[in-house]
Amino acid sequence: MMRTLVVVRSLKMGGMERVAVNLADAFHEAGYESHLVHFRKVKRPLRPEHSGVKVHHLPLQQRNRLTLVGYGLEVLARLLLNPLMGRALFLGLGVMGGVVFRHWLKRFEQEHGRVDRIVFRGIGTFELVWSFRDRRARYVLENIFHFNGASRRKALFARCLYHRRDLVAVSQGVADSLRKAQTLWKFRPRSLTVIPNPCPLRSIREAMLEANDAIPSEPYLLNVARLVPAKGHDLLLRAYARSGTSLPLVLVGDGQERDSLVALANELDIADKVIFAGNQYNPYPWMRHARLFVLSSRFEGMGIVLFEALACGTAVLSVDCPGGVREILKGELETSLVERSEEALADGITAALEGPKPEVREQWLDDFRPERVAQAFVAR
């Protein structure tokens, strides 16, 4: 039986972390022996749906610090590299982090057997172990690259993280961004493949039936995302106010922008219609009961929430942002895309709310079925 290992920094509530869990489940459903390892504990971790997925915790930072070299490199990075270069802490952490991970993997394989495929999800994960190299490993890039400023620093980082590695982009938009980065920062991956995120239709549709008394009984607009600048909630609030719709707007998620968004809702005189629902361990009932799901991000590597909302039978509207949203909203769904501006998004909301809730077609989700994604990872 083929054995797989998905590696993620933590199992906190977040899109990338949820995808890591979904991928581990997809490997299990495909008949593989599936393992999932995380580096940092959180109070309420995400869990795989299938009990057959074996979850492991490697306290990477603590073990790194137990080695004299690892502790010294962390101190050096904190006191020297980070102040000089900015965001360079991983250069120190990842040297011994990779050694610690390789040692853990060796012991893991002594107990469970040789791993056939290792999948690292997210740059934040493989930053912590960047010195680790293995031909069985695939490194998944979840988002597009940004090219403003500090090109020499970014070139150094890119050579540490991406050079001569087998990379996987979650969308063609991310892959195109990587190719531009290759030219600017002078690195060359061993390979680059596009594999979309899995959408576990069956488990989503089971989870969406869960009762939740906090969900409004009346129709509402919905956004599910961390409240951070990249998700563009300021644009969403302004467009929502401009649309003049009487339906409430529900924001599921939390983050650093919450206070400023509450203040903006008050400034726009829509505070009585905007519901800040906070983090929800199960967002799918909220998606199921929504009249319209609205995405307002500045960029999205894939936009997993779009096909999660579609899986729940809810119509979607998205701004046309850099990344992978066009790979979800294609064909008949292209009408769900609008220009990323306050006026266009407001007009899109108004148009989308006209008439009955539209039917969602099953074939729109075919590219993201877990069995296809699992097979794509082990085939390369």
Regions found by a protein language model. Name each.
Residues 15, 337, 354-380:
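A charged, aromatic-enriched C-terminal amphipathic alpha-helix characteristic of glycosyltransferases
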